[in-house]
Amino acid sequence: MAAPEAWRARSCWFCEVAAATTMEATSREAAPAKSSASGPSAPPALFELCGRAVSAHMGVLESGVWALPGPILQSILPLLNIYYLERIEETALKKGLSTQAIWRRLWDELMKTRPSSLESVTCWRAKFMEAFFSHVLRGTIDVSSDKRLCDQRFSPLLHSSRHVRQLTICNMLQGATELVAEPNRRVLETLASSLHTLKFRHLLFSDVAAQQSLRQLLHQLIHHGAVSQVSLYSWPVPESALFILILTMSAGFWQPGPGSLPCRLCGEASRGRAPSRDEGSLLLGSRRPRRDAAERCAAALMATRRKSEVKQMPRAVPPTRVTRRSTQESLAIGGTDSKLYLPATSYEASGTKQPSAPAAASASSSTSSKRAPASSASQPKPLKRFKRAAGKKGPRTRQGSGAESEDLYDFVFIVAGEKEDGEEMEIGEVACGALDGSDPSCLGLPALEASQRFRSISTLELFTVPLSTEAALTLCHLLSSWVSLESLTLSYNGLGSNIFRLLDSLRALSGQAGCRLRALHLSDLFSPLPILELTRAIVRALPLLRVLSIRVDHPSQRDNPAVPENAGPPGHIVGDEEIPENCLEQLEMGFPRGAQPAPLLCSVLKASGSLQQLSLDSATFASPQDFGLVLQTLKEHNLSLKRLSFHDMNLADCQSEVLFLLKNLTLQEITFSFCRLFEKRPVQFLPEMVAAMKGNSTLKGLRLPGNRLGNAGLLALADVFSEDSSSSLCQLDISSNCIKPDGLLEFAKRLERWGRGAFGHLRLFQNWLDQDAVTAREAIRRLRATCHVVSDSWDSTQAFADYVSTM
């Protein structure tokens, strides 16, 4: 009896609130109603008035509202603002109520964007709160404009921060300064525990203050937080200092910026054990002997540069004397004791303006690319950095030894020059022998093997971020001991000959105890190595790799007869020795134009006995026999293979090899995407293919998009599902195959005649079904009784016009 009594008490309490609200509303509307010329408007419903009053006084009535019966609470939920709606979620679930429809409506009305069709939204509350946090942080939404977003009792950032799993920082690092401000300390602490992915999009040049804020933000979110993935997208002209800052912080290195306060969390972790200054330097690997070696190397670089400048100067101008101080200032490295500076300067002597520190650092990347082998000579020139406006030299931001020693370049000391007027300068002739990147001390890069680190991320992604030699050296040096890294994506970064340094660093990483790298995704326009040789080199360097995706859009320079033979890679990168056994489970390769040597691909496949998924995109072989050699290798050495995909390959002359594949490989899924499979001898080949499939009991998925199957081919394919077939096919993709409605209807009737049960999914995208809409609808209706049909409303006439216009 206790439960009904409690329910009755809550109902009475709600009625009292309703009565009080009605009286208050009536008294407020009485005066305006008398003066209204058109007469009083219809009063709101009693329940709506009550709900509004409860929503407006939730600060006092919240506990009582939570205890209301489910039917009453369900009517109040849409009237609450987002803060109380979020807080009441757990109580609503206990009463069997869902708020997902309310959050979806809020998304449609306030965000006014449609989620991607590829995105499956499992929780609209979390999605709304995450987007709301980002909009408030960037200032793109005004919370005071809507009463559902405005409540003086709550902080929009703090209340929504615990739902943020992914945060994107754009342009001029908007939001970084706000997050590290003292009023938002609790917001940052919440983000540190909830945020998993940090993305940077379309970054532009930023000032010193913004970079300092980003430094503190990354330290909190990565070193003391839960961020495990950092992704950079579309950064056409990366700023060297900012890029290196993001990389080093992601790798677990931390050094306070000039004038910044010590980290509170670091102090709590040390429990009173404050590391000495020497200990802090050792942590970051900035040891004096290595700094001196770097300075000597830098002096030699600058001396060579000055010699070339003197040759181009008028004779009246005296030659420039390179001093230790001029070298340090031009490189903008900071972090050295002021006692090491000598009084002489070279910029004033030559009449050249002294660049500011960031400008010098960012401009230094292009000349350092001369360290590359000759095979990179025809690579596209890297994008030049933006230069400071004329007449604006900018103040020096590193003053005194104390501030300089805390600069990021105290950790990563970058030595490079500036490429001017197409001038060629070979760094290897200057100092430190041949600067091949193998000796980090010559470049001022610290030895990380013995260094201690903070927490680092496990996934790093760089999409369309051109890497200068300076940035590539930094990345490779960090990768060599980044044992926590599990997945690395480098997409269209213009690596060029820096790919050799990357392979060296990956080989060094693989030799580290506890190396976790299991997935590598690499794609670029050009490569100094043919793609198969590059694949062999990666597999040798990373034998524990599980997933490898590699794509090169254009042929390598070694495939060009005009490139001299001595422009090849180092001998330890590419060799003829046999590849050792590896752990590859998934291999995806996108080939440039030109025939590929089948033996090289077979050598990779033979060493990949655990391979389960293989995808070849745009692969071309010299003859059908070479393609058959690859299939024979798969049959003999890749017994665990389950999925095989061919895309954009001309298999019109490889019909016997395709039949061998269907008869001899025990695959679960095969894809022939735009492979011109039925271009030749379709009348003879289709029955042979159908017969092979009818005897294949392991194949469950067949994808044939873009193969000109047509109505005749579709009807022949229907025989796979006949009564005498032992096929287990349950997924069929016949998109883009010139199928007409009458052929699809006949296909549906044959499936009905044979009485096969539901076989799964049928994909019909981009076929000629719009030529007879009535017949197409009837065919799809019949098919849906047998399988799940996925189709679209495709305009075939417009598509044909587009095709003709491009001929």
Swiss-Prot record:
Q: Which organism is it from?
A: Mus musculus
Role this protein plays: Probable substrate recognition component of an ECS (Elongin BC-CUL2/5-SOCS-box protein) E3 ubiquitin ligase complex which mediates the ubiquitination and subsequent proteasomal degradation of target proteins.
Give the pathway annotation.
Protein modification; protein ubiquitination
Explain what the record says happens when changing L46P. No association with Elongin BC complex
What molecular function terms (GO) are annotated for this protein? identical protein binding
Keyword terms, alphabetized? Leucine-rich repeat, Phosphoprotein, Repeat, Ubl conjugation pathway
Q: Where is the composition biased (Low complexity)?
A: 352-381
Q: How does it assemble?
A: Part of an E3 ubiquitin-protein ligase complex with Elongin BC (ELOB and ELOC), RBX1 and CUL5. Component of a probable ECS(LRRC41) complex which contains CUL5, RNF7/RBX2, Elongin BC and LRRC41. Interacts with CUL5, RNF7, ELOB and ELOC.
What domain notes does the record hold? Answer: The Elongin BC complex binding domain is also known as BC-box with the consensus [APST]-L-x(3)-C-x(3)-[AILV].
Q: Does the keyword Disulfide bond apply?
A: no
Q: State the taxonomy lineage.
A: Eukaryota, Metazoa, Chordata, Craniata, Vertebrata
Protein's name in the database: Leucine-rich repeat-containing protein 41
Provide the residue span(s) of the region labelled Interaction with Elongin BC complex.
45-54
